[in-house]
Amino acid sequence: GVYPPGTSVELSNGWRGTVAAITPGNLLQPKIAIKEDGKTKIVDLSTEKLFIKRSLDEQPREEVDFLKDAE
């Protein structure tokens, strides 16, 4: 999926971070800010062999209601 900046995510290697930036034309491989040892490291998914495993944020209420109605 597409994750807007500010979304908390878990990467395929277990790291957790926040979507920092999206590159137009490459929405599925954003830059992720990872906090490690008190420092922030930027991981560019377009150059790393990682992917977003899941969002750590709850789905917006409207999205949950829409999905329930579709069942």
PLM feature spans:
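Terminal helices and disordered tails flanking the catalytic cores of nucleotide-processing hydrolases
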Residues: 1-71
